[in-house]
């Protein structure tokens, strides 16, 4: 059922491909059209890889999943693609848990830990919106985290539950309500929230689970659909009249009645088998435990159609065989879809790691009678299962790993930047005088109003260096793992605006540290082999100075390691190619300028400085109570629910100014939590 097959991807931008972008776009598009299953875009820092991806999507016109390795990067990509494709369906699919404690059993202390979670209502809505977009239209881009490989409701069962309402159709009001209840919608006459409905005579209002703004009003007359309208649930203002509407289930785990009846019988059969096994092995406590828990769940499913933890019965509900791969987001995409894996050297290993951690926890639950063995099939995909199901793939990385290099049918380089900037010049200096040498380099950069990043190997070294630099009057900040996201963004903003001149850290490979103001990266103890001094890490760290026309990297080392040599050789190769390109085309390098991006929640457009400034202002403006609420996901969820109730109450009482103020407060706190 696709209602929007003809809408093309419409790339909206003032830029034209430049540098290596035109040839990279051409090669990738050609490779996709020729049937290459896997390709690699090897793009250096600051070469505009996201813009290249956007052009590939626009030229191939394929529904696309863009995978990132964490929520922060996914949110950043979502904002960028939303700006590139304002007329298409750009959606966001990440884990909807603000807080998640999975159920677990610790045999050594005989401790059972109940599942405890706080679900982010806004992200839940965005996930439902993402699957709706994939089912309804081809012009869909889904920006997802590794959450995409976790079990999701079966798409066939989900599609069976769709409710189509057409103007002029004959339908009984009670039948309509019954269908909504089967789709897990609840009646609520007091609070009209997402996933609820209300009845006023022959008028039925439904707030779709995937909608973030508008609700549906269905007016019946003598068992006939008289009119269908979209309206604003806050103000009651009508938006538009439509001839038909499709209402989607409230959850991905919704199940048709016949599937549920069949599942209940197969769960009973499995329970009997497990009881027999426990009794034969004289495990009477486990037998009692599994019988009590399972019978309670079955009763809930018979009475209400669902139960807490229903995902543990997903194998029965979907009718899959034992050990079969779970349905995931990838089951919702068409066969000719495109998958782009950003920062693939980090994202791909994550995909492989998810299954093992999940399995060991669940085995304890099964062995000690807390769950049936079929719960083991409620899991993320195994790596080999993921490999079998993925569509045409483009890996994107500045430093690809062995897997992507070996797997790719074509490796496309994007070394020349649109700005003409060349990779930083590299110098090697002795370790003995590294601290004093760094201090003199900082003073040189300070005179030119430029910034410095320094990376150390240990926390102790970073702390000592920060203290030493402060003694000499250097405006320095120390970025470490204990700093939360809001504070981190604030520090980065203050480095860019000159509050600090120097940033000291251990791992400078995280997002947000590509700043045009940084002209020097100093790598202390560069000859100590290890994760932070591997070839890939060195190349990426050196690249932190690549957005400045005077970019330079100093490696402090007493010997040349293999990793250092490879990183230097690769950087020199890129520099030669970039310099030659600039010479042939008469390009004068210019420092990078960060483009405008859309914020994920408010939809407003700010440039990078505005966003960071706005967040740091919010951070400073937070009261002690608000900081306490933001630090505890459970408190945050309760507080948001309270504010939403107050907003709807104010709206019902026609106090629209108060409702608008509460709405802005909700958006402000949501943005704060996301960042």
Swiss-Prot record:
PROSITE patterns of this UniProt entry? HELICASE_ATP_BIND_1 (PS51192), HELICASE_CTER (PS51194), UVR (PS50151)
Q: Where is the Helicase C-terminal domain?
A: 434-601
One GO cellular component term noted in the UniProt record for this chain: cytoplasm
Its annotated compartments are: Cytoplasm
Gene3D superfamilies cross-referenced by the UniProt entry: 6.10.140.240, P-loop containing nucleotide triphosphate hydrolases, UVR domain
InterPro entries, from UniProt? Answer: Helicase/UvrB_N, Helicase_ATP-bd, Helicase_C-like, P-loop_NTPase, UVR_dom, UVR_dom_sf, UvrB, UvrB_inter
Give the family this protein belongs to, as stated in its UniProt record. Answer: Belongs to the UvrB family.
What is the name listed in the Swiss-Prot or TrEMBL entry for this protein?
UvrABC system protein B
């Amino acid at each position: 059922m696709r209602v929007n097959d003809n809408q093309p991807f419409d790339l909206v931008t003032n830029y034209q491909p430049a540098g290596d972008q035109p040839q990279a776009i051409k090669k990738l598009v050609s490779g996709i059209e020729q049937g290459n299953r896997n390709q690699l875009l090897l793009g250096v820092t600051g070469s505009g890889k996201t813009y290249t991806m956007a052009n590939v999507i626009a030229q191939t016109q394929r529904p696309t999943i863009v995978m990132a390795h964490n929520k922060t990067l996914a949110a950043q990509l979502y904002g960028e693609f939303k700006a590139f494709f304002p007329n298409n369906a750009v959606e966001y699919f990440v884990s909807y848990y603000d807080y998640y404690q999975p159920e677990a059993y610790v045999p050594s202390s005989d401790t059972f830990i109940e599942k405890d979670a706080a679900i982010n209502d806004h992200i839940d809505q965005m996930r439902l919106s993402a699957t709706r977009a994939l089912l309804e239209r081809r012009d869909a881009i889904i920006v997802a985290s590794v959450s995409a490989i976790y079990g999701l409701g079966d798409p066939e069962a989900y599609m069976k539950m769709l409710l189509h309402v057409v103007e002029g159709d004959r339908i009984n009001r009670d039948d309509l309500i019954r269908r909504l209840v089967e789709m897990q919608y609840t009646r609520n006459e007091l609070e009209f929230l997402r996933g609820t409905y209300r009845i006023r005579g022959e008028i039925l209002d439904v707030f779709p689970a995937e909608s973030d703004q508008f609700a549906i009003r269905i007016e019946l007359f003598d068992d006939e659909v008289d009119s269908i309208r979209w309206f604003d649930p806050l103000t009651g203002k009508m938006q538009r009249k439509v001839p038909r509407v499709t209402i989607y289930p409230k959850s991905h785990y919704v199940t048709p009645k016949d599937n549920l009846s069949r599942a209940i019988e197969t769960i009973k059969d499995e329970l009997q088998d497990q009881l027999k096994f426990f009794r034969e092995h004289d495990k009477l406590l486990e037998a009692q435990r599994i019988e009590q828990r399972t019978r309670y769940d079955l009763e809930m499913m018979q009475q209400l159609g669902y139960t807490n933890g229903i995902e543990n019965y997903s194998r029965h509900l979907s009718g899959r065989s034992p050990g079969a791969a779970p349905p995931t987001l990838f089951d919702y995409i068409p066969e000719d879809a495109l998958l782009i894996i950003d920062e693939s050297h980090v994202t791909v290993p994550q995909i492989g790691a998810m299954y093992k951690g999940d399995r060991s926890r669940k085995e304890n639950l099964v062995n000690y009678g807390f769950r049936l063995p079929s719960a083991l099939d409620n899991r993320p995909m195994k790596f080999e299962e993921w490999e079998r199901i993925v569509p045409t793939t483009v890996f994107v990385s500045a430093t690809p790993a062995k897997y992507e290099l070996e797997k790719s049918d074509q490796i496309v380089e994007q070394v020349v930047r649109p700005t003409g900037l060349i990779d930083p010049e590299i110098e090697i200096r002795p370790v003995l005088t590294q601290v004093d040498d760094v201090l003199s380099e900082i003073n040189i950069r300070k005179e030119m109003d430029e910034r410095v990043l320094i990376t150390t190997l240990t926390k102790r070294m970073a702390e000592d260096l920060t203290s030493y630099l402060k003694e000499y009057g250097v405006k320095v900040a120390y970025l470490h793992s204990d700093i939360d996201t809001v504070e981190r963004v604030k520090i980065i903003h203050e480095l860019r605006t000159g509050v600090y001149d120097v940033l000291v850290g251990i791992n400078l490979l995280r997002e947000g540290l590509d700043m045009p103001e940084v002209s020097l990266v100093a790598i202390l103890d560069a000859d100590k082999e290890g994760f932070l001094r591997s070839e890939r890490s060195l190349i990426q760290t050196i690249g932190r100075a690549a957005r400045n026309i005077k970019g330079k990297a100093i490696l402090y080392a007493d010997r040349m390691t293999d990793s250092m040599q490879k990183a230097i050789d690769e950087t020199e190769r890129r520099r030669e190619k970039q310099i030659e390109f600039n010479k042939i085309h008469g390009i004068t390098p210019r420092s990078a300028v960060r483009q405008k991006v859309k914020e994920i929640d408010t939809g407003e457009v700010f440039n990078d400085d505005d966003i960071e400034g706005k967040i740091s202002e919010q951070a400073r403006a937070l009261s002690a109570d608000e900081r306490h609420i933001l630090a505890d996901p459970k408190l945050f969820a309760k507080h948001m629910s309270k504010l939403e109730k107050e907003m709807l109450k104010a709206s019902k009482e026609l106090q629209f100014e108060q409702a608008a103020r509460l709405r802005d407060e909700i958006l402000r706190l949501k943005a704060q939590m996301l960042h």
